[in-house]
Structures are given as C-alpha cells and as structure tokens.
Amino acid sequence: MNVLGLSSYPVEAAATRYRLEQFVGPLADRGITLTVRPFLDSKAFEMLYQRHALPYTLLALVKSGLRRLKDVLLLSQTDVVLVQREAMLFGPPLIEWLAVRVFKRPMVLDLDDATYVSYTSPTYGRLGKALKWFSKTDDLIQWADIVTCGNHAIAEYAKSKGATTRIIPTVVDTDVFVPKPHKSDGPVVLGWIGTHSTFPYLRAIFPVLQDLAKTHRFKMKIVGAGTDQTNIPGVEVENLEWNLKREVEDFQSFDIGLYPIDPSLYAENWAAGKSGFKAIQYMAIGIPYIAAPVGAAAEIGEAGVTHFHATTNHEWLQTLELLLSDPALRQTLGAAGRRHVVERYSLSAQADKLARALREASCDRKAS
C-alpha cells in the first residue's frame, strides 16, 4: 500500500516528526510505504515566526503553495492520503478536496491539536487570521474516512461532526529517548521545552520559581521559548534555542520536568486539545514532572506515582519543594514513569493502530 503523507511543517516540527516521520520505518515493516511531503521546507519553517522575516515568509508561502500543487500529481499513484492537520497553511482545503473529490482517494486526517479552535497568532495577528480558513478542520473531518486523534478531547469533537475516530497518542521511540545513566554534579535542573506559543504557560509560574529560589538552589533550563533572553529575577536561568540534534540531550539534562498549562491564556478548548506529549517525553527520559491537569495531561501517567499535578501557584510551590528536597522520590517517580511509557505508549503499538486505520480507510472506500 502506498500512502502519501501531507504535513504543514518539515521534520523540525514535532507534529511532523512524531506523527508521520517516525512511522515511516515501522509502517514499511507492516507492508505500507509512507511518503511524507511537507508544505514548508526547513528554512521557511525556521523563519516562520520571526517578524523581521515577514517578506521572506510571504514569498516562501507562495513557493510552498506552488510546490504543493505539484504534489497533486502523486495522487494517481497513492492508495490513501494521510493529512497531518492540513495540507497547506493558508486558504481553503483545495488539495484535500482534489484528493477526495477528484482523485477519489480515501483520506485519513491526523489531528494532534485543537486546530478547530479559532486562534490568533501572536506573530501575524490579523494578517495570519485573514490567511487562515478556520472552517477548514471541520471540512476535513467531514471528508475524512477516519480521523486519528491525539487524545479523547479531539476525538469527541471529531465524533460530534460525524467522524469515525481512532485515538493514537503522540509517542517517542523509547530506544532513542532513554534515561541518562549519570546526572552531572551541580544544582537540580528544572526543565521545560516548548515553543513561542506555549511559553506563556511557563511564564505564568515565574512567581513560583522566584519564591522557590529564596529557599532552594536550582537552575531553570528553558528551551524553545522563542526569545533571546529570559530573565527571572533571583533565579538562575539557562535559555536555549530549540535544536533537533540536541533534543534528546536537552531532555536528559533535566532532573524535574515542568508542564504548566493555563487555559485562561488561550481558548479553553485549545488548551484541552493539547496532546500531553511533553508528559510522555519526560517519562521516557525517566524524570518526574509536575503538570497542570488539563486535557490529555490529566490522563497520561499516574498522578502520585509517575508525577504530580498542580493547579494553583501554592500547589506548584509545594510539589517543587517536595521534589527538590527528596532525590530518592525523584528517582522513584522517574523510574515508574519510564516503565509506564514502555508498557503503555510503545511506538510499535501505535504503528499497529495507524496501519489498521490506513487499511480500514482503503477497504471502506473500495467497498463503497
């Protein structure tokens, strides 16, 4: 079976890397050839959220659109189209319409985020909103033979639109994401890896970190915030740009993972639609973490066994103080988290689910 995977972003984006690219090998072992075609190339993605690069980005979007039109020629050799969120970052779902209506190809839509919630980009504002087609996700859900969903919240929304759904959480290869054998000397490292859009969640607990620093020594390591410098008065901070080659190493450098989510900062449904992937990454590395129990983050792992939940600033402070003062507890929770991920979130099991969904979509279309 030949499957054409259409993604918005290149491999540097977690959605493409972990929802498509990492399945190429496992699907091949199951008799399915997955060809991934991103809309943006790596350079355009790197410049996408830099305001000074707006002219370059607009030109790159035009070039990407023309390149995507060429991908239509591949549809005649394709058994199933697998769309990760959307085939193009702007405009109506033209490519998907051609695939389903003109080429009559079965489509599997993969949603790992609440893209059906209206969202205004802090970088592009009204311009970005004008280029977006916010009914696109609903259209794609209705056209898809199957919708693979990153969590239950997304699945419930897709079902409300009449979709057949399959839940496939975003996972990592636990042979790659492994615990670091020996921790370095020095202060305990609190860690967070994210993007410019999720950085406000971390910023919301800066007052907690400042209070914590008055009584405990630690270092706050921030990766991917989208800012050159991050200053938290009274707190030792290491601020790094995200780098694909360094991703696993960055996670391994943490002693405690932070996973704050504040639904009040964006639309509540947008926060609830987050896949909880960071929790899986923390557990795979074998470290304890503290998470706001929102959306999938409330469902993944076992609170009190693999991690702790915190909603208020007081709860964040209490749990951080507990973990900072008890190395044995950190080790126990981290080991439990590692076991949990290996047993319940293996790449092989998710590859089986995806292969079944692709074959089911193909068979259903042939039967109809």
Predicted regions and their residues:
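Conserved catalytic-core segment of nucleotide-activated headgroup transferases in glycan assembly
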Residues: 11-26, 36, 173-176, 183-253
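Acceptor-binding helix/loop patch of EC 2.4 sugar-transfer enzymes
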Residues: 40-53, 107-137, 186, 263
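Membrane-proximal helix-turn-helix segments that form the acceptor-binding/catalytic region
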Residues: 65-77, 91-110, 115-118, 127-147
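Carbohydrate-associated surface elements
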Residues: 153, 171
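Nucleotide-sugar-dependent
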Residues: 200, 241-284, 290-301
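Conserved acidic donor-binding segment of nucleotide-sugar-dependent glycosyltransferases
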Residues: 303-314, 322-328
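A short, well-ordered alpha-helix in the C-terminal region of glycosyltransferases
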Residues: 322, 329-344, 350-353
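C-terminal alpha-helical cap of glycosyltransferases
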Residues: 347-368
